[in-house]
UniProtKB/Swiss-Prot annotation:
Lineage: Eukaryota, Fungi, Dikarya, Ascomycota, Taphrinomycotina
Any Pfam family matching the protein: Oxysterol_BP
Species in which this protein is naturally found: Schizosaccharomyces pombe (strain 972 / ATCC 24843) (Fission yeast)
Highest taxon, organism lineage: Eukaryota
Name of this chain's protein: Oxysterol-binding protein homolog C354.07c
Entry keywords, A to Z: Endoplasmic reticulum, Glycoprotein, Lipid transport, Lipid-binding, Transport
GO terms assigned for molecular function: oxysterol binding; sterol transfer activity
Location(s) in or outside the cell: Endoplasmic reticulum
Length: 397
């Protein structure tokens, strides 16, 4: 193809640089011919977001008032409804904010093993604090602990996923959980994570849809089942959901329907009434507050990826590839050194609990589906004398 012909190719804007249709379709071809989990496939620079996947853990908490005021509701039924409202706002930030910011969906950077992310939000009840750590790299797995001590509310979460390509769509199966604990009531809410489909690839405008169902299961016997649907070829509304709240083996108390990036309504079947529930566009998200990058440790996300992020922001993809390759090679070298010395990487804040029977039984019995065993339990700082944001060079489990 001549230079003139190349300049006339259809393009799409990505960051500060237009991407040609042929370049984009080459990327799609790589997806289609790749075998195995897509997390092991190195993505081209033009589709990267410049933000580490570990930092995405914070998106669940960008409406801190909805989070901390869950404890204010007087009955288990109302608290379940409050948990659902917080969860829906988290979906909107976790799975739609990149599309809003960039105009199209972007792939996050894969965190390195041991990567750390800290931050906080102010709320009417006190500070909400987050500690996150990349606890596995192959396959990728992140864990986080979030607490508002004054409100007596904590969240522990971990996320791992499997991904693949079929037809025109990337599918991501999320296998982790969110667990919300309310100290005052000794209540725990076990929450499964939605499966994701990345649509619009053939039109050079990828966006996320959620599909299937997720569950919120409480030890109060209240259950929420959330069904997701999207825009089909001929019908349907993008980002639609229907949530049904019921006590185990009882009729529904509440039904919430709408769009998890837009508005939703609450129906109370016993009263045969429908009222307003939530309007995402009317809410203003509160991004996490972090310390200045100059004060961050070497293992903190924004420090690890700062040169890659800066190059992505300027559209210099050669520098992106070079800096990203340097980080990845350093990690490979570290793993080889550990293997040669018989060392195993130990996590700073979390420990894997294989036989997490209480949660597994609660979820499996309630939703009648297989729940993968185990959970990354927050155990506090195993190296309190070490500055935040740092990891020992070599550690034994």
């Amino acid at each position: 193809m001549s230079e003139t012909s190349e300049q006339m190719e259809e393009t799409v804007q990505s960051g500060n640089e237009p991407i040609s249709k042929s370049t984009w379709m080459g990327f799609i071809k790589n997806l289609a011919t790749f075998t195995g989990d897509l997390s092991t496939l190195s993505a081209p620079s033009f589709i990267l977001s410049g933000t580490s996947l570990l930092e995405y853990m914070s998106y669940w908490f960008e409406f801190p008032e909805l989070f901390v005021t869950i404890v204010d509701f007087p009955t288990p039924k109302e608290r379940m409804l409050a948990v659902l409202k917080w969860y829906i706002t988290g979906l909107s930030r976790e799975y739609a904010s990149r599309n809003k910011n960039y105009g199209t969906e972007k792939k996050p950077l894969n965190p390195i093993l041991g990567e750390l992310f800290y931050g906080s939000w102010d709320s009417s009840k006190g500070k909400v604090e987050l500690t996150a750590e990349q606890v596995s790299h192959h396959g990728p797995e992140s864990a986080a602990h979030v607490v508002c001590k004054e409100a007596g509310i904590t969240v522990d979460t971990h996320n791992k996923y499997r991904s693949g390509f079929s037809g025109r769509t990337v599918y991501v199966n999320q296998l982790g959980q969110l667990r919300v604990h309310l100290e005052k009531y000794n209540e725990t809410y076990y929450i499964t994570l939605p499966n994701i489909s990345l649509e619009g690839l053939w039109f050079m405008a990828p966006y996320i849809e959620l599909y299937g169902s997720t569950y919120i299961v409480s030890n109060t016997n209240y259950i929420t089942k959330i069904d997701y649907s999207g825009r089909g070829y001929f019908r349907g509304t993008k980002n639609s959901f229907k949530a049904t709240i019921f006590e185990k083996n009882e009729d529904p108390d509440y039904i919430v329907e709408g769009v998890w990036t837009g508005e939703s309504k609450l129906t109370i079947p016993s009263l045969k009434s429908t009222i307003f529930f939530l309007s995402i566009p009317s809410l203003e998200a509160t991004p996490i507050t972090v310390k200045p990058e100059s004060e961050m440790g070497d293992w903190e996300s924004r420090n690890v990826w700062k040169e890659v992020s800066a190059a992505l922001a300027s559209g210099n993809y050669d520098i992106v590839s070079s800096k990203k390759s340097t980080i990845e090679q350093s990690q490979r070298d570290m793993r080889k050194k550990e293997e040669a010395e018989g060392a195993v990487w130990a996590r700073r804040y979390f420990k894997w609990e294989e036989h997490d029977s209480d949660a597994r039984n609660a979820l499996a019995q309630a939703v009648l589906e297989v729940i993968e065993p185990g959970f990354w339990i927050y155990i506090g700082d195993t190296h309190p004398s070490l500055p935040a944001g740092e990891q020992p060079v070599k550690r034994m489990e």
